[in-house]
Amino acid sequence: KDENRSLVAFKAGNRTVTSLLIKGRYPDVKEHLPSEEIPAYAVVNTQDLIDSVRRVSLVLESDAPVKCQFEEGKLVLEAFDNEVAQASESLPIELTGAGKVISLRPRYVIDGLAGVHSEFTRISFMDKGNPNKPSPVLISSQAAKDDKDSDNYRYVLQPHLLLGQ
């Protein structure tokens, strides 16, 4: 037994969920959630995106990121593993605003998409105004390609710096 570890448990009905408490201060999530609609975003089929992220991430070691290139009409996912293995897939998207190239960890993308209970997902590109640091992206549900968010689900992801690719 480790005396330095603390657990928290939540019980609802006949289910109990336990979690390890992490020391430190939890970041203020509200500062990362915009109060108004984000003008630049892509709409993609949720299941197609999950499947593609899973496939291209098969060539990656551990928790390496996937390069995501959002262009007019398509999203290109690319994964590289030390120049030995690589994978690439393209998905149709509806893009509003300028294209974007970001790098995301597949595990976190799939975790975020697991909460989307609609046919389509909106990936919004926030702009924090710092060109030296990638701005967060917001994943939310969307009932149809041309519809607004269908529920209140929002998931914030922080991209990684793109180095050498």
Which residues does each PLM region occupy?
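DNA polymerase processivity clamps
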Residues: 1-22, 35-165
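Specificity-determining recognition surfaces
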Residues: 28-31
